[in-house]
């Protein structure tokens, strides 16, 4: 065949990683192939995809100098000004195939921009053949599959790419602009890039690109680019494109790839060590009314020895708190008192003055701290007072001693106990932070309600440690709600322990690790980090998933009812949903960070002529993509500047609530069998997190050690004051601060060094930012606190307290 005579090669096309120009929907791509402006062929339209594979053949009449131009368009926007342009390539036929010798060539080319400089992305794969034999469609399919994990981008507005029309594939992800500045510049295209963990370097030569991806074509889920995974391990990706590994031997998941010299014994030992750390942390969690005076603010020794009250009429508000500390009784009993002994030989004391009895020796003086804020803002003890001088207890109250001789009080009217002496002014007065007054009082009220009282009898639950999920499901689901309200008695198969609280704590610890494990596809990790959880919208892969969600709801209710804690933490929106509160755009940050940025941009900018949106969203479930109307006929209703707020609200509700509504309703049906909805609604979402998970003992030294500073030095006065304030706070206030800055009160098992952000490990950071007249601001996705340069310790403490105590909800960005 002469080079000057036209030849008739065949053409097949596929593309991968097209640019998603619309924020909320996928394009309907088709290709137009043109030779010399005369021969034009158009492919069919592939609906809603960034990786179309047409597998259509066209006959072309070309010579060596012919230019083949292939353009990709979005059929949805073909009538718009830019015709939905998605990229173009131009190929000189003589450069890629020898028309005289014939042959079959597979080419991979990067899509290029047009003269309009619209951002494009992705690759076009072409099969050119000069014979009539059928091309190797398997090869084309393999190449198509090999690009599935290529970098993808999403954007809001057509922009000029800063350097090239596509990002280079590399081993590390490009830096997200929001990572350093959460206040996203509206002129910048919000994007996220999730390359595979070991992507091959991009090559200018199409053949090189083709080969590099072809080498990964046959990788199964049991291997990756580093080789075969150990026996029983599988590689998976979550909904955010993050790779994690499943160990089917132990039914656990991890973000860390198992090493090639995998040692099962060493791995098991490490898991057991981590489990012990988590167990100790879990068992140390508590709530305000469970903690002793040791967790109260410490007073100077000199002030504790003060015995003389101040002059009357002091302007300082004085509050009182019983420490429960006692001293040994010596000498004679006070007038009117008598000591007697029960038949069991236990001494008790009769006060004939008030005709009351008590276990407490009136000679054993109970110290009453009376402290208030003086002129310089420090706490000062006013006096100590013996219990015997306080008079009788109110009707229905009883004083008792713990086995460590610490006094506590029983209110038989409400069947509750407290450390606070009812004869003293409430320790929860104006000197205590508002949130603490509210939470503790809510807790006392909540637990005093008849629906939360343990019924007579026992509820026996027998489980095997190595099969705790299935055994617990069978045991808890076979019993009625009223049976579950009886005293809980846990027994582990093959163990002789009696449950006086320790076994039930161990039970809830182990069970929460199992039932929230992403291995079972019921829950998945959030966009915030890899330890807060959200409901998996694809949990329907298990046909019994709704029964399991009802079971999990029962377990959460059971833990609250029996005053136990679960070692699990959810996104803020989940707690809001439990309280039947309306979710907001801020809650989206923990579910889908990119969508949160895009919706925020939509609200803050003019979208007329920029975004072609309707009141509908595209959703993919088990490979099937469908359009969902956000309101009746939504796919035909355009989004404008006037109705975009409603659109954002509906998208937020669909993404957070509607997608998992079926699962969540099953969860709540089980939960409300033990905890009535009207009772749990007394809490807010942050208090509900503490009610379910308890309050952790936070190691401030570890926190400080793994903190970064921007604009500050560790030696700066404001930083020194910050850590002094944190150390002076009790465990509950520290947990509140942790919630405020990271979105959860959970601490990773290995401490703050393993703190996670939305894009992987992210250390706690204090940044110099803001006006000293303003409050500190947190960025929960990045574990960052914007701290203005306050001039004094008092100002910093005041501003921090207001920010932490009065701010509601997660995602303060």
Curated annotation (Swiss-Prot):
Residues 265-292 have a biased composition (Basic and acidic residues). Its main location: cytoplasm. It catalyses: S-ubiquitinyl-[E2 ubiquitin-conjugating enzyme]-L-cysteine + [acceptor protein]-L-lysine = [E2 ubiquitin-conjugating enzyme]-L-cysteine + N(6)-ubiquitinyl-[acceptor protein]-L-lysine. The active site is at residue 781. It is an enzyme of class 2 (transferase). GO terms for biological process: protein transport to vacuole involved in ubiquitin-dependent protein catabolic process via the multivesicular body sorting pathway; protein ubiquitination; ubiquitin-dependent protein catabolic process. Gene3D superfamilies: 2.20.70.10, C2 domain, Hect, E3 ligase catalytic domain, Hect, E3 ligase catalytic domains. It is found in: Cytoplasm. SUPFAM superfamilies: C2 domain (Calcium/lipid-binding domain, CaLB), Hect, E3 ligase catalytic domain, WW domain. Residues 227-260, 331-364, 391-424 form the WW domain. Keywords: Cytoplasm, Repeat, Transferase, Ubl conjugation pathway. Its EC number is 2.3.2.26. Residues 131-235, 251-351 are annotated as: Disordered. Residues 1-109 form the C2 domain. Residues 148-167, 251-264, 293-307 have a biased composition (Polar residues). GO terms for molecular function: ubiquitin protein ligase activity; ubiquitin-protein transferase activity. Belongs to the RSP5/NEDD4 family. E3 ubiquitin-protein ligase which accepts ubiquitin from an E2 ubiquitin-conjugating enzyme in the form of a thioester and then directly transfers the ubiquitin to targeted substrates. Probably involved in the regulatory network controlling carbon source utilization. PANTHER family: E3 UBIQUITIN-PROTEIN LIGASE NEDD-4, HECT DOMAIN UBIQUITIN-PROTEIN LIGASE. This is Probable E3 ubiquitin-protein ligase hulA. The lineage of its organism: Eukaryota, Fungi, Dikarya, Ascomycota, Pezizomycotina.
């Amino acid at each position: 065949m002469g080079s000057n005579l036209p030849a008739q090669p065949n053409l097949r096309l596929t593309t991968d990683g097209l640019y998603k120009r619309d924020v909320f929907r996928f394009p309907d791509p088709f290709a137009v192939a043109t030779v010399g402006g005369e021969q034009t062929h158009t492919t069919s339209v592939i609906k809603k995809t960034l990786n179309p594979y047409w597998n259509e053949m066209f006959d072309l009449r070309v010579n060596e100098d012919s230019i083949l131009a292939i353009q990709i368009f979005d059929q949805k926007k073909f009538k718009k000004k830019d015709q939905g342009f998605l990229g173009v390539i131009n190929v000189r036929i003589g450069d890629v195939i020898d028309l005289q010798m014939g042959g079959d060539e597979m080419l991979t080319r990067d899509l290029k921009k047009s003269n309009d400089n619209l951002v494009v992305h992705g690759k076009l794969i072409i099969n050119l053949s000069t014979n009539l034999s059928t091309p190797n469609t398997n090869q084309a399919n393999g190449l198509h599959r090999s690009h599935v994990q290529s970098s993808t981008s999403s954007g809001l507005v057509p922009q000029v790419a800063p350097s090239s029309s596509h990002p280079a594939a590399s081993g590390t992800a490009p830096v997200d602009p929001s990572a350093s500045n959460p206040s996203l510049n509206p002129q910048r295209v919000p994007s996220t890039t999730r390359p595979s963990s070991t992507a091959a370097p991009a090559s200018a030569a199409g053949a090189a690109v083709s080969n590099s991806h072809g080498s990964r074509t046959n990788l199964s889920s049991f291997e990756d680019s580093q080789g075969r995974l150990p026996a029983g391990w599988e590689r998976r990706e979550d909904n955010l494109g993050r790779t994690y590994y499943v160990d089917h031997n132990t039914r656990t998941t991890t973000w860390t790839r198992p090493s090639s010299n995998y040692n099962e014994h060493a791995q098991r030992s490490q898991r057991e060590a981590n489990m012990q750390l988590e167990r100790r942390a879990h068992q140390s969690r508590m709530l305000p009314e469970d903690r002793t005076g040791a967790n109260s603010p410490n007073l100077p020794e000199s002030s504790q020895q003060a015995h003389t009250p101040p002059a009357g009429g002091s302007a300082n508000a004085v509050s009182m708190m019983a420490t429960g500390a006692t001293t040994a009784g010596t000498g004679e009993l006070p007038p009117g008192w008598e000591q007697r002994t029960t038949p069991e030989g236990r001494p008790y004391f009769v006060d004939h003055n008030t005709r009351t009895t008590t276990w407490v020796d009136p000679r054993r003086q109970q110290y009453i701290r009376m402290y208030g804020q003086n002129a310089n803002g420090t706490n000062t003890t006013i006096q100590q007072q013996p219990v015997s001088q306080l008079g009788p207890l109110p009707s229905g109250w009883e004083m008792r001693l713990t086995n460590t001789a610490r006094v506590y009080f029983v209110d038989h009217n409400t069947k509750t106990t407290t450390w606070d002496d009812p004869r003293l002014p409430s320790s929860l007065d104006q000197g205590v932070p508002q949130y603490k007054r509210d939470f503790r009082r809510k807790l006392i009220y909540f637990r005093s309600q008849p629906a939360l009282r343990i019924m007579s009898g026992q509820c026996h639950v027998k489980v095997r440690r190595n099969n705790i999920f299935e055994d617990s499901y069978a045991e808890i689901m076979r019993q009625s709600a009223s049976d579950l309200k009886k005293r809980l008695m846990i027994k582990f198969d093959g163990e002789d322990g009696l449950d006086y609280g320790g076994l039930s704590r161990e039970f809830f610890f182990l069970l929460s690790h199992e039932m929230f494990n992403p291995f079972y596809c019921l829950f998945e990790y959030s966009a915030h980090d890899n330890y807060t959880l959200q409901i998996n919208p694809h949990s329907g892969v298990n046909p019994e998933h709704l029964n399991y969600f009802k079971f999990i709801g029962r377990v959460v209710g059971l833990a609250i009812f029996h005053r136990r804690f679960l070692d699990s933490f959810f996104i803020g929106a989940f707690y809001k949903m439990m309280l039947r509160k309306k979710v907001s755009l801020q809650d989206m940050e923990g579910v889908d960070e990119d969508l949160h940025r895009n919706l925020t941009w939509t609200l803050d900018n003019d979208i007329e002529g920029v975004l072609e949106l309707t009141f509908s969203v595209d959703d993919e479930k088990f490979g099937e993509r469908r359009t969902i109307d956000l309101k009746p006929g939504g796919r035909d209703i355009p989004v404008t500047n006037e109705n975009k707020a409603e659109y954002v609200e509906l998208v937020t509700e669909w993404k957070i609530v509607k997608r998992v509504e079926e699962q969540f309703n099953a969860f709540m049906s089980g939960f409300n069998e033990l905890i009535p909805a009207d009772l749990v609604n007394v809490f807010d979402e942050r208090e509900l997190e503490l009610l379910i998970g308890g309050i952790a003992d936070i190691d401030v030294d570890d926190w400080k050690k793994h903190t970064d500073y921007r604009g500050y030095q560790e030696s700066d006065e404001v930083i020194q004051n910050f850590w002094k304030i944190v150390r002076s706070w009790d465990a509950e206030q520290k947990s509140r601060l942790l919630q405020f800055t990271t979105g959860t009160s959970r601490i990773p098992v290995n401490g703050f060094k393993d703190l996670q952000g939305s894009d992987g490990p992210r250390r706690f950071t204090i940044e110099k930012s803001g006006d000293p007249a303003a409050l500190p601001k947190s960025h929960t996705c990045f574990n960052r606190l914007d701290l203005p340069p306050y001039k004094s310790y008092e100002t910093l403490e005041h501003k921090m307290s207001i920010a932490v105590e009065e701010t509601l909800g997660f995602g303060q960005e």
